[in-house]
């Protein structure tokens, strides 16, 4: 049978064991529903409750609806008042039971009724201490409860069930000021808990929205709905209780998390669930009281100016994102409300100082406290101590971890004043016999019978007094305490004189002998202290100097450490300015909930040590960020044990703590404090004297307190009483000379002599032997003795023997269990005899222990059967006694409970004499069968003999050893007995390695969270967003540090281990910054150096091989404390981080506690270290989302040729036939080259997939589907189309291992259709490592000839990207941005033998012309093309490229970049799809191409080209066939002209249908009005034509290239947008107006078709730009005005470039202003032409601030004559000042007559700006082209093609019938070789076409040299 407690019902029963089952995991987290309660204010009549009383209570409460009022909480029990509202008269259950005679009612008057003023000292003191009674935390039951009647009094303050936060004086935290009433009353929140508050608020909102739990009257804690924002908050009702009649519908509530008070309706209240009480009230009340005072007499009345200044200070600092810090100086009750006296400051200003400077406050001279104020703590002060300063101090108390208290020498006068005031007050108060228990501040009598100031902490079983001026804690009786009157301001206002300190760079645990040495050398003598740092609780980290000796260094030497600072460097400024980083592991201390103050602020607020009349702010010489310890160092001293023994001042409202008592946490146990979340403290050191034992605050402890026993008050070891009495440090007074009494001086000189004899002497016998004669002048030194027993020391508290790995020594075997478990003694050690002498002296041990106080692991003095006493450790409790092991011998025995004694403290500093060992290479399991024989031989060889022992390895608290005697190696016994020769290891010449094999980093126990789990962690090491390390907030590296340090100190260099070490090997290494040992894994090896990763922190370090030590397997098995992370959803193969990403990320994640959610885990590198892909949040902020703005996406597209093999949709080629153009031009034949269907998906080199490092971005691979295109387009906002050469970089470097390039498989070669080409990127964009021997296969898909060629490392490459490189170039921004090299010819080739989807485009609603062919000039050719594939795709192939040849020539990859022609090929921009065939212009980037044909690098220039877009549904460019005919160049018998045409076809993108049903009215009106009204402005005069005619050169070969752009309609802004629109036209398309580029709003999706035609033997004199309007067969042959409503679907533009090989002159248009009006003439300035003998540069650019277009023409062009036709009625020559004006009227045909335009010889390019403004008629926008000259030395010009829509669309772009202007464009002006006049008579016939037109525009590029 077992007894079980039903947590959901509260009853306990005995049940059968077999009826008990394991509770499912999902039910374990649910809290118990039953609440343990106790009725308040009643007690039983007798010892216990009678059965009648219990029955009466059951009848009264069972199965009834009751109202419960929680009065307080004691342990796990709630003290409640039970009300039964069903009763008419008395509703209190306590009073009902009392009236019925079943209980005794005890009523306590509330505190509020005892706040009157009394004149005499007795009444005044009585009143003060009655005010100290805390109804929440009292040791008496009557003080734990309130009267129900008093609760009904509106003047009393009800108890709040919300748990408050508590802060000790001196603490400094970061806060948020949440509510300001006045400088005397405001509310703050702990900033470190802001994330928890946000979670709670979200939980409250969800609870109130999903649950309707009405408020029940009588409860004070509730949820209230704020009238300000409608949200629900945790609230506490302060007055106008719902139960009262007045204001029954309204209550005043305090929002406990914000401090705001508001009156709300009762209907806006809800009941609060118990789980919402878990988080403490976040707002705490603060005041500047007694730091500064207002000008008024009332210290709490502040004027509005002061309050307003306070508000401004907070608001301005919040806007500047300054950290608000708060330092706590004291705690007080102000009108019964707990308030903290604080100062709020930023790194630059303090509110106290500010208000004084502004004249709103004054420095306060303390006289007395206000009657309504009762101090709960003494004031804290830094005593004007500066960080980095130097002070003379006297140490008054030392604890086991070398934490000590000291007094400043300069405060001696203050200490004497306090002593005098104490004596005076005691004499007065003792006249009155007060029955009131003193409050937390009182006077206590020390064992020297003197009174001292103390802070009282009342526990359940004892009362502890912390003497605030000396630092020690003692137990006192109630009779030994006196209250402090309120007028004793000297005692209340003088700050505490004991300053808590600790030494810098000290370990967590210190051996007792070191502590003893420290005490003997520092107590009662003046020392100098350098202040290194200040912790958050006010403790100072110091370096101590005794004269010229640095005590820190001496201690480190005794500890066997290397001193990090040189001894004797007392005045070293660097040392003084170096802040001791106490949290080097990167985690803020978990011992408190507030941030480190000294390391985070620039000012240290100090309270004046004497008058407290102001604050002094000292600026430290060094300032570090709050978490600046992320300096990538794995310091395991994190945090050091400086926090273990801190004195805690807290006002405790929790009744379980019973009183306002600060507790000094002994270093020997962990203590749960209300104000702090502590780390687990280190184990007992056993170094504590009886005089300074400190009780634990744990309510479950078997001992709630431990008595001082007149041994050293501040000693670490018990000593002889005579020494203890005089060297102990009780509270005391200093004389002016700081001299010790003769007795103290003598005791100090005696030190620790005669310890053995004095130990057993009674302290009480000698308590008065050396009592000082003058108590006011001497330091008192005896404490009152107590009868309770302190906890015993543990085995781990003993110091360790100094044994190093590989050490050889003479030993004796003391005890043997097995060959793998025996104990030895070091022969040279003589301490064993000393121990025996101390334990077995004449007196013997007298301090017998009670068995119930002895626990496992305790060290005791045990009596053995031989009649002697030995040191032992308890290993087990048995029925017949205690099983103990004798630590100095190794054997065990059962000891009777009556034979155990306390171990003398003097023996706690001596290590255990026995050393546990095992024979190396010998295991018990391997010789179990022969164990008896083996043990016999082992005992024979080892018994009572001195042996030679070599310590090989320390593992699991046991040394593996090799024993040898005069017969040889004893380890060989294992071999002789087992008979297995394979187990015979040769005796190593150097220290042997254990049998453990070298484990890899993958064998570490990685403590990673589960997938999907969210944990709290700190970033311990940050490399980048894709690689950083985190430590869990629950990680405990302290205990691990001790083991790792111990293993490292015992290790030696092992040559065998160094030979076996490899990448992934775990090891133990010393970190160079702090000389501590840390676990690490080897990540890289090079020569004699290794790079290791500190696995518990994440940072790396490179060190010498000999510095690496073997890591024991047991330590390697301890879970790793950190784990690597990377931000989720950022793939480096798809993008990269910007340069600011690392800095921003580091600042974000190192600020504080992070919330990390693990999404994916993968192993990294050879070390197999698991890395977590995580989402990171800090203070509710999503770091992943924040980092998105620093991410630059790159398109990783699939191969369109490979995609075509698996295409699921088939599109007939008949649907994509190019009409009429093939019929017209019969100059070339269709290409016979098939599409390279075998192209690889991933670029490869010699068969190996070409991979890249983290910076590599394969940006240009095409998108295989519309879905992928839309997805990529949505996720990127960076330029992916690059526009710069790498020619110089490739030429200068023969090393191709870091070639910046982008692989693109969109561009087919002329001869190898569909062959991928390569485009250079900027050097900062891409770096791909590959071997030069693999280049051929890397680009095997570029051309079929490359399989038979080789590229050598010392040769240059031309690497280009296809014209269809990325989707993004499809938008109008690209068309306005991308500079195209016009010298490069482009041909349209057919992707035969495969089905190809649209390149980089999303599939439209229906396929359009999508075939590519080469040299298609007739219907037969088109038919041939149609038969080659079911789904054909257009690809743009740059011509005359060294890699992707436009000519039908063999590919020559080995090219001299300085001499080869046509080095640069332009990328014709493609329009990318965005969802439904539309493109976001912002996501478009530009390509920059350059063709270097026969030119040197210095002669290469960029020719800007801006492909234009369809600006509206039916706004199309019309060109007549006659214009095309005029543009045919005259035949030149010496030239060979080749025409290549490029067709770009754009699909419809959610545009109105062909019939324009969406705009019927516009069609009717506009078509009728503007039909046949298109005139063709000529931009050149006849004089221009004559001058521009190129000279005939029979040796030249002219090559015409034509570019056809077919643009489809896209979703454009509505016609309401009528603002000015800026367009870019470089070059202008024929017809006067190009497609208009839209930068922001317009987005077009293009498909591309290519037609190549060769025109040979053309006369260059007759060359003209050719315009071909091709929507159908008949449409392409007619000319004249055409209504645009018949050309709804697409516009096809074709450019034809004539090229020649001979040098020629170029007339370049320098300035051009072109204005288009719907009802006005278009004026065109003349185009000056520049003549150059070396290169023909024709650039027309549009320049706007955002982006720029580059155009570069490198070849020479010979232009003989170019004419600009003008109307006959033009009589005025507009050529003035080199300007050519041309006006176009859409209603009338106007001819333009302009003279020849000349340009300066050095002009290389021109910039034009197009401006569209609305005309009076509103039919069109005025389009102005304004030239802006660029800098002469620029390599290219920049232009912008942007359409910015604001209020509405231009009507001309919306209406499908708005005619476009026809006429020559800037390209024709600058390149045409012959005259032409556009004719529009026949264009009327085009109305009947099917809505598609193609406009072919050609220009004459420069011939090759």
Swiss-Prot record:
Disrupted gene: phenotype observed: Loss-of-function in embryos causes arrest of karyokinesis progression.
Superkingdom of origin organism: Eukaryota
Compositionally biased residues, Basic and acidic residues: 573-591, 622-631, 715-726, 1553-1588
Coarse class of the protein's main subcellular location: cytoplasm
Complex formation: Interacts with FRGY2 (a component of messenger ribonucleoprotein (mRNP) particle) during germ cell development.
Domain comment as written in the entry: The tudor domains recognize and bind to proteins with dimethylated arginine residues.
Assigned keywords, A-Z: Cytoplasm, Differentiation, Oogenesis, Repeat, Spermatogenesis
Tissue-specific expression: Expressed in testis.
Chain intervals with Acidic residues compositional bias: 1491-1500, 1522-1535, 1876-1887
Organism ancestry: Eukaryota, Metazoa, Chordata, Craniata, Vertebrata
UniProt function note: Tudor domain-containing protein involved in germ cell development, more specifically the formation of chromatoid body (during spermiogenesis), Balbiani body (during oogenesis), germ plasm (upon fertilization), and for proper miRNA expression and spliceosome maturation. Component of cytoplasmic mRNP particle through interaction with FRGY2, and binds to maternal mRNA related to cell cycle (RCC1, RHAMM, INCENP-A, MAD2L1, HELLS) and a germ plasm specific mRNA (Dead end/Dnd1), it is proposed a role in translational activation of the maternal mRNAs repressed in mRNP particle.
Positions of the UniProt region annotated as Disordered: 564-795, 1213-1245, 1449-1599, 1655-1682, 1827-1905
Pfam families: TUDOR (PF00567)
Localisation per UniProt entry: Cytoplasm
Ranges of residues in domain Tudor: 1-30, 215-279, 435-491, 853-910, 1060-1118
Biased composition (Polar residues): 592-602, 651-660, 687-704, 746-766, 774-787, 1663-1673
UniProt xrefs under InterPro entries: SNase_OB-fold_sf, Tudor, Tudor_domain_containing
Organism this protein belongs to: Xenopus laevis
One GO term of the biological process aspect: piRNA processing
Protein name: Tudor domain-containing 6-like
SUPFAM superfamilies, per the entry: Tudor/PWWP/MBT
One term under GO cellular component: P granule
